Amino acid sequence: MPRTRKKVEVKVAPKGAKLQLKWIRSAIQAPVKHKLVIKGLGFTRLNQVIVREDSPSIRGMVAKVPHLVEIVQQ
């Protein structure tokens, strides 16, 4: 039986859309890659809220660490 791929819908945000992200859990025991994602998003301290452009790259970074970061507002 041939394998078929799932069709995935990609959500495209309107131009200029912003995401508010909040760092909710410490990355002390997290793997190094997760720490690098937190740093790459621009977080410097716990419970910090930052605003980033809504892009596939930012959403991908948030998807890597959903247990550490939450989307406050879209």
UniProtKB/Swiss-Prot annotation:
Keyword Ribonucleoprotein belongs to the record: yes
Gene Ontology BP term (one): translation
Gene Ontology MF annotations: structural constituent of ribosome
Stored Pfam families: Ribosomal_L30
Superkingdom of the organism of origin: Bacteria
Keyword set, alphabetical order: Ribonucleoprotein, Ribosomal protein
UniProt-listed SUPFAM superfamilies: Ribosomal protein L30p/L7e
GO cellular component: large ribosomal subunit
Signal peptide limits: none
Subunit structure of this chain's protein: Part of the 50S ribosomal subunit.
NCBIfam families referenced in this protein's UniProt entry, alphabetically: rpmD_bact (TIGR01308)
UniProt family annotation: Belongs to the universal ribosomal protein uL30 family.
Full protein name: Large ribosomal subunit protein uL30
Organism: Koribacter versatilis (strain Ellin345)
